[in-house]
Curated annotation (Swiss-Prot):
Gene Ontology CC annotation, any one: cytoplasm
Gene that this sequence comes from: dtd
InterPro entries, sorted: Daa-tRNA_deacyls_DTD, DTD-like_sf
Tree of life domain: Bacteria
Protein name (database record): D-aminoacyl-tRNA deacylase
Taxonomy of the source species: Bacteria, Bacillati, Actinomycetota, Actinomycetes, Bifidobacteriales
Keywords of this entry: Cytoplasm, Hydrolase, RNA-binding, tRNA-binding
Assembly with partners or alone: Homodimer.
Length: 162
C-alpha cells in the first residue's frame, strides 16, 4: 500500500457523474483539522499492510504541541480523516509518456483493502470520511504547514512484518 498523507485544516470531496455535474447519489463529504489521505493498493497488499499502516498513521506525531513542536497525533488532537482511493499512486512512468497502472491492485481487491483500511483507522477512534471508490472525484483541501508525507509499505514496513 502507498499513501500520500497531507495535514489539513479542512478537506472535502464530491463525485462528478458522466455528464460532468455533481452526482446526486453521493453526499459530499468534508472534514475539519486532520489528514487527507490518498490511498493506493497493490494486489500483494493484505491485512498485515493495513494493520501496520493504520497504526502508523494513527500514531504519527505531526501536529504541534503548545511549544510548536510536532509532537501530537491525530488521536491527540481529535482530528478527522478524509480517505480517497487513488490507483494512480502506482503509476509507472519509465517508458513513454503515458503512465502505466499495471502495478495498481485489481479493482475488486483494491476496493476491499481500502474498505478494511478505513475501518482500521476508525477502530482507532478517529472519524473517517470517504470518497467513492473508482469514481471521478473533486477533492478540495487546505494544507496546514504544509505537511505532506508519503508512506509505502513496500519500503517503509520493517522486513519482519511484511
Amino acid at each position: 500500500m502507498k499513501v500520500v498523507l497531507q495535514r489539513v485544516s479542512e478537506a472535502s470531496v464530491d463525485v462528478v457523474n458522466e455528464l460532468g455535474t455533481l452526482d446526486p447519489t453521493f453526499e459530499p463529504q468534508q472534514i475539519g483539522p486532520g489528514f487527507m489521505i490518498l490511498v493506493g493498493v497493490t494486489d500483494g497488499d493484505g491485512d498485515k499492510q493495513i494493520a501496520w499502516l493504520a497504526h502508523k498513521i494513527l500514531n504519527l506525531r505531526v501536529f504541534e504541541d503548545a511549544q510548536g513542536k510536532m509532537n501530537r497525533s491525530i488521536q491527540d488532537i481529535g482530528g478527522e480523516i478524509l480517505s480517497i482511493s487513488q490507483f494512480t499512486l502506482f503509476a509507472d512512468v519509465h517508458k513513454g509518456n503515458r503512465p502505466s497502472f499495471i502495478k495498481a491492485g485489481k479493482p475488486e481487491h483494491a476496493d476491499l483493502m481500502w474498505i478494511k483500511f478505513n475501518e482500521a483507522l476508525r477502530s482507532g477512534g478517529v472519524p473517517v470520511k470517504e470518497g467513492r471508490f473508482g469514481a471521478h472525484m473533486r477533492v478540495g483541501l487546505v494544507n496546514d504547514g504544509p505537511v505532506t508525507i508519503v508512506i509505502d509499505t513496500e519500503h517503509d514496513m520493517p522486513d519482519g512484518t511484511r
